[in-house]
């Protein structure tokens, strides 16, 4: 019988909520188009090869603060990865594309000398239809951090010429649609300071083990060359992809099979 029983409800939705149906079809078409492109162009049907997070943070024992457990934030392990990588550059410059509430900035800023955040200001957020609470939450956790400079601008249209070749670590977490990720990735590579510099992309994964094909394609198409693409990996147990300077061991772990466990102690701040 298959799913023919859904034909009636689908047709009703086409008449009663056509915009929602078209939006869903557009998203599905983009995902499948990007998936097909990645496979045909780069041969990566299984996604990026994966690095074990323990290889980047072998002595992982850290505390994540300012964690909201709300939509729009990163996973705990994403922040742990950012902090582990930031510790490589205690005197370095970090730039983040898309910071919103500033949870990641609050976690990274104590570990680096200079932090730059680029994100929409209130006017831009209202223009794209963000609710009032989201507008008020902008920079909530990055306000007052002494080494954080916030630039309220669209990363896709900003002139990065003054920052080219000056950043030790770049975190790309702004637009998650293919065109925007491609533009941000191209910009990120121009900001790399030297051969030790790192790029981290958030939401490469829809989950810990499944690629987000729009973001994935944007990363690959935005990278300058195959030599750069060879150094881009997924980090296990996170939603992140990374561009790394060093040679690392990577593989395709068996989906669903745990190779490690984590211990989590959870508290709430009294406020």
What are the residue ranges of the model-derived segments?
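N-terminal auxiliary segments of SAM/dcSAM-dependent transferases
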Residues: 2-47
